[in-house]
Amino acid sequence: MLMDLISLFLFAGVPYYLFFEKTGTLGKEKIFYLSAILVIGGLVLSNISTHTISMPIVLIALAASLFSLYKAVKTYNIYKLSYYILFFNAPMLIMFGAKESTLYGISLLLSLVGIFLMGKYYERNYGSANHRSVTGITAATPYAGLMMTIYLTSLALYPPFPNSLMFLNGILAAELNALWYIAVVIIFFGNFLIAVRVMAKTVFGKPNTNIHYIDLIPREWLIHLILFIILLVLSAVGVKELLL
């Protein structure tokens, strides 16, 4: 039972919802860093422990996941979006086997690092990480639009990006039951809903004529290109895992 609670604590955003959201003692950037570190800790723990998560904990994780989905579709802040998506995917990180959870967790974290960096780009050039008024970036800033599209498409579980391949691999490696089917449907369509909501206007909408658009500078573009290459490598790993 203790291991179950530790896994829930590390993956599902429990410290954020119980403490940091209420007190505001950490900024949005630091919350993302801390959340990512906790998830990495959970992935390490899952690889050194053979413990099977109990169904009550999975149900709690699913309930927390639905709450995170609600928060994700309500926020316009890209920093918040990055860690809400991380919390939303907690049931899969808990329910997958150690190897499958690790692969999915790594690809998820890399995609979210990309989203987080896009939040920093927004904050630096538009005054905040809020994407609501900065619409149509693909037409106005092609490089920023391309990278945002890549990260959101990966998070929406579209192949050939690694998130979808690792997600499918985790499902194929698991012993499915009714709870599994419910979790898979929630996570799959939830990720899709979150990504499409942002892409509809922010990425593919009409540019706001009141905004002076600034594209990614070469240094930023290089960082995002490296992240994209790593995602491609993970896609190859995902294909290999599916073929084994």
Where are these regions (language model features)?
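Alpha-helical transmembrane segments of multi-pass membrane proteins predominantly involved
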Residues: 1-244
